[in-house]
Amino acid sequence: MQSNSSSFPDWHGTTILAVRKNGSTVIAGDGQVSMGPTVVKGNARKVRRLAGGKVVAGFAGATADAFTLIERLEAKLEQYPDQLARACVDLAKDWRTDRYLRRLEAMLLVADKTAIYTVTGVGDVLEPGESLGGGAVAAIGSGGNYALAAGKALIDLDLSAEDIARKAMGIAAEICVYTNGNLTVESL
């Protein structure tokens, strides 16, 4: 996450991972927020339950921007109850076309019991492909590629979705200096 102004230091942080396996969906997020080389917070909560607990969302990027997007997603979920894909697509459309929203610098990882979506400001609503065993993994944030690789390596092993998420996030925290092991884990 980089600031738009050279007068502010770069903000980094956040690794969010979603794992779906055997009817269980988990989103895990680390707690670290860094400004340049300094950790400014180690216990941030970047994963939230929405829609009466039926949806879980994690965010990466500018915090205020992410909160704005979470609020917009909640409104879309009220407008389209039990239609997560439609709510995400409608949010992405608004995000891309609205003059105010298109300036927001964040990404969302959103899931219900049956699907996981990565939602971006350029209009992307991406659903991860399934593994041979039927599971799925998606990740965003500074350590997202590390968590994604670890999750994909673990998905077909005899582990629960939560165990995979915790192990993959632990691996990401060992590699990415902007990710810590202080996890928030929400399961559906």
Curated annotation (Swiss-Prot):
Segments crossing the lipid bilayer: none
Alphabetic keyword roster: Allosteric enzyme, Cytoplasm, Hydrolase, Metal-binding, Protease, Sodium, Threonine protease
Cellular component aspect of the GO annotation: HslUV protease complex; proteasome core complex
GO BP, sorted A to Z: proteolysis involved in protein catabolic process
Catalytic reactions of this protein: ATP-dependent cleavage of peptide bonds with broad specificity
Notes on how activity is controlled: Allosterically activated by HslU binding.
Chief place of localization: cytoplasm
Active-site residues from the entry: 14
Function noted in UniProt: Protease subunit of a proteasome-like degradation complex believed to be a general protein degrading machinery.
Similarity comment text for this entry: Belongs to the peptidase T1B family. HslV subfamily.
NCBIfam families for this protein: ATP_dep_HslV, PRK05456.1
Protein name: ATP-dependent protease subunit HslV
Protein source organism: Caulobacter vibrioides (strain ATCC 19089 / CIP 103742 / CB 15)
Lineage, top ranks: Bacteria, Pseudomonadati, Pseudomonadota, Alphaproteobacteria, Caulobacterales
